[in-house]
């Protein structure tokens, strides 16, 4: 393989890695947002009770 061919293959690998990484990052952001909404729903219903902040301190109830 010549130097140009090796450089071209290197650039293609870098481009493919960047595209895959960007796509996976966007997908994980959506999953994180969905998990945050679920957690907010749990916290909202849970913390109406006066003992909830003590019992469920891991949820950071206000």
Curated annotation (Swiss-Prot):
Residues 22-40 form a propeptide. Its main location: secreted. It holds the Pfam family Toxin_8. It is found in: Secreted. Expressed by the venom duct. InterPro entries: Conotoxin_a-typ (IPR009958). Disulfide bonds join 46-52, 47-61. GO terms for cellular component: extracellular region; host cell postsynaptic membrane. The keyword Cytoplasm does not apply. Keywords: Acetylcholine receptor inhibiting toxin, Calcium channel impairing toxin, Disulfide bond, Ion channel impairing toxin, Neurotoxin, Postsynaptic neurotoxin, Secreted, Signal, Toxin, Voltage-gated calcium channel impairing toxin. GO terms for molecular function: acetylcholine receptor inhibitor activity; calcium channel regulator activity; toxin activity. Residues 1-21 form the signal peptide. The short (45-61) amidated synthetic peptide shows very low or no activity on rat alpha-2-beta-2/CHRNA2-CHRNB2, alpha-2-beta-4/CHRNA2-CHRNB4, alpha-3-beta-4/CHRNA3-CHRNB4, alpha-4-beta-2/CHRNA4-CHRNB2, alpha-4-beta-4/CHRNA4-CHRNB4, alpha-7/CHRNA7, alpha-9-alpha-10/CHRNA9-CHRNA10 nAChRs, when tested at 10 uM. It is also non-active against L- and T-type calcium channels, as well as on voltage-gated sodium and potassium channels. The cysteine framework is I (CC-C-C). Alpha4/8 pattern. Belongs to the conotoxin A superfamily. This is Alpha-conotoxin Vt1.27. It comes from Conus planorbis (Planorbis cone). The lineage of its organism: Eukaryota, Metazoa, Spiralia, Lophotrochozoa, Mollusca.
